């Protein structure tokens, strides 16, 4: 049996547990974090009819309080401070979104948002 197939079955089982368990999204995200070997997993559902998030859940290696504090600080910045949103929310976008294709290192070095909030939490990249 292929290793990825094992993960697939495991993740499917965790998905089925989400509506049955208060910690369902947390458990699923924690396992995805481990499988992908990343520092943060943020799952979002976007309603493109209104360009709003209808669901948002993030889990990472840092304590939840660190991410909650960072999210509150993040909300104080105008959306224009984060160039990822325009590309991410583009209803014409096809396929997987990866920010490294248009957010340069030079921009990151000069960005108050990246320097004060995103980088300290290990949130440089989005895919």
Sequence positions of predicted segments:
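Regulatory input/activation interfaces that engage signals or partners
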Residues: 10-127
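Short, low-complexity N-terminal regulatory "tails/caps" that precede and couple sensory modules
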Residues: 1-5, 9-12
């Amino acid at each position: 049996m292929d290793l990825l197939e094992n993960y697939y079955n495991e993740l499917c089982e965790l998905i089925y547990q989400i509506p049955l368990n208060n910690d369902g999204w947390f458990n699923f995200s924690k396992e995805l974090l481990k499988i992908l070997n990343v520092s943060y997993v943020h799952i979002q559902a976007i309603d493109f009819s209104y360009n709003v998030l209808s669901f948002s859940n993030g889990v990472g290696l840092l304590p939840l309080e660190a991410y909650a504090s960072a999210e509150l600080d993040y909300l104080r910045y105008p959306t224009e401070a984060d160039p990822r949103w325009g590309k991410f929310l583009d209803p014409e976008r096809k396929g997987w979104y990866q920010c490294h294709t248009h957010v340069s290192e030079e921009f990151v070095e000069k960005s108050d948002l990246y320097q004060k909030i995103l980088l300290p939490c290990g949130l440089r990249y989005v895919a």
